[in-house]
């Protein structure tokens, strides 16, 4: 069954409209140096004390899921409501994921990732980012390159590098496989590709919280996201992963511009696609 659109998005400054546009859950809108210019590992885990974890990454695929969300947002302090959906479809040694959210005035933004599943997690083959135009990143493992449709120079492909869609399922699968390895204060840094560059995304584990959501009451592990970019305009974002749903996201919250721009996604339903 082909995947329908879904969501992880929300916040890129659009030069033509000046609007905070839906783009990908905890955007790493970094202008940082490309992966070809760094020796950073594609996935790095550090303890709360800053020590690098030595154990190899363990990963467990979440079951196929369709997650529907209610969305409450603000743009320049003006409130709006909409809906969103995340689809995740593993099939044998392959996976497909897609996301989309409708934003008033702006329209829709769709992101998708397709690739294979390895013993340590996801191996993306292509990432597509579609709004007014379609852009992509192609992971060419044989040539050892990641290619960008927007004209950026190719960068080195390193096994374990993710894209802006797959990165969330990579994190979910890592925690699901070995939750004891990720106590409060743990930092997970993953190199993730957009349609123009590769940049590090860092998730910090903040602990378990009880959430009251449209789908009901549930326990979830809170992670906060940060990047090395200064272009996010005071972007603050958080992600809640539910152990009862194999650590899939049940809440996503983003704020920028002192809270004048805001997005809060809360799980409404969880079904099989």
Task: Please annotate each region the language model reported.
Residues 143-171:
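Acidic/charged, solvent-exposed loop-and-adjacent secondary-structure segments enriched in E/D, K/R, S/T
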Residues 171-172, 178:
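Anionic-ligand-binding alpha/beta catalytic cores of soluble enzymes and soluble regulatory domains
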Residues 38-143, 182-273:
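Acidic, serine/threonine-rich low-complexity disordered tracts
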Residues 13, 35-37:
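Polar/charged alpha-helical tracts
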Residues 3-22:
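Bacterial N-terminal signal peptides that target proteins for export
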Residues 31-33:
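N-terminal signal peptide c-region/cleavage motif recognized by signal peptidases
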């Amino acid at each position: 069954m082909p995947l329908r659109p879904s969501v992880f998005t929300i916040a890129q400054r659009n030069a033509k409209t000046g609007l905070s546009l839906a783009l990908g859950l905890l955007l790493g809108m970094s202008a940082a140096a490309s992966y070809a210019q760094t020796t950073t590992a594609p996935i790095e885990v550090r303890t709360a004390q800053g020590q690098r974890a030595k154990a190899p990454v363990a990963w467990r695929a979440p079951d196929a899921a369709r997650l529907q969300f209610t969305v409450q947002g603000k743009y320049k302090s003006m409130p709006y409501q909409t809906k969103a959906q995340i689809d995740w479809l593993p099939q044998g040694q392959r996976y497909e994921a897609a996301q989309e959210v409708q934003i008033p005035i702006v329209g829709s933004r769709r992101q998708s990732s397709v690739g294979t599943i390895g013993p340590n997690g996801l191996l993306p083959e292509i990432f597509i980012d579609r709004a007014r135009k379609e852009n992509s990143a192609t992971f060419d493992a044989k040539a050892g390159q990641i290619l960008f449709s927007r004209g950026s120079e190719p960068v080195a492909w390193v096994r374990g590098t993710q894209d802006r869609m797959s990165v969330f399922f990579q994190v979910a699968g890592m925690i699901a496989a070995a939750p004891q390895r990720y106590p409060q204060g743990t930092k997970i840094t993953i190199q993730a590709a957009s349609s123009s560059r590769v940049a590090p995304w860092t998730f910090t584990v903040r602990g378990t919280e009880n959430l009251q959501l449209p789908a009901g009451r549930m326990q979830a592990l809170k992670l906060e996201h940060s990047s090395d970019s200064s272009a996010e305009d005071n972007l603050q974002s958080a992600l809640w992963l539910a152990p009862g749903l194999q650590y899939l996201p049940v809440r996503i919250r983003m704020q920028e511009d002192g809270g004048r721009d805001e997005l809060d996604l809360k799980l409404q339903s969880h079904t099989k696609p």
